[in-house]
């Protein structure tokens, strides 16, 4: 059915190809600095604690701008929002390089991080909303989850290439990956300008005086359709708790593993970050396989969360690089399980017309956890040791277990996995429910005609 639908609508194939191209190029550009960011900030003169103050400022920026940038995408258009993202991200990346050259200090880097967060929030949601709108307008009737799953494979490969390439470029100079990112983003802008147009969505002007009211309306919808529902609230709290540790742990692992290895080879950090991407993809595949035999999503959530807690504690206690490395990969593989399963659960409960708004609100709650976790664990890592911070942060993630347990006790159809036993395909690695289909009328559908963009 999918192949026939695509044959009847070649514009759908062009839209999907454009989505894969833009998502891949954007991720390739962004990932160029992910493996060296902490090393770059340390080399720029920031202390270990100050590095995470700057990173926490980024998390704060995502909380601050998530809803306003979503309003931009839902009014001025997805194309404008995406182009704004690329422009702001390229500029803020160059600002980082300039700040390092003048030894600007933590306050300036924190301001640069907030600007970088603005760039990313213009992107989140706009791309997916553009895809769904365009496919609906072209008459596409295929499964959206397959498109998103393949898109995740494309971005996963792009992350691998970006982090490894960034690590190798960092061997030359730690600023080179940042310059490369800005150059790549110029190419992304050119491609997006040519292929990305608002089809199936009519942009409209939003007077500045109406912006505050629009933001308040979106925030109220996020509370009413998200936070007010107990299972969604519990999942948001669990994500807030886990994000506080994982956002810190991702960047703290770079200097920590190099210290354990007793090496200053920047390329190692890039390869490790690429390994993180691979382990996350492996976690996605665990979902694909386990959902064929597992009847409840909360079973996967509880199992993965327990493994993550143990892995984080081992990572902090060991003094061996070769023990810490697989512990880190086990930790991030758990993210590949928890992320899509949690996402699928949420999508089963959120009305299609409120989906983007609630996802945006969910991102805000997680971002708030990222602010507190990075500042607190960053301070502990500097005062005691990075290993001690990994242990404390890992133990803190155990708090997600009773929250997932409470969700399990509530039951409901959202906890049921439509695996082979139900006569349907299992949940996709991307986390979109298998019943998500353009023009379908089943529970959990994505209604493209109403698709909105989360900031």
What is each of the regions a protein language model found here?
Residues 181, 189-210, 406-417:
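Helix-loop junctions on the cytosolic side of multi-pass membrane transporters
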Residues 83, 87-103, 306-319:
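C-terminal ends and interior cores of transmembrane alpha-helices
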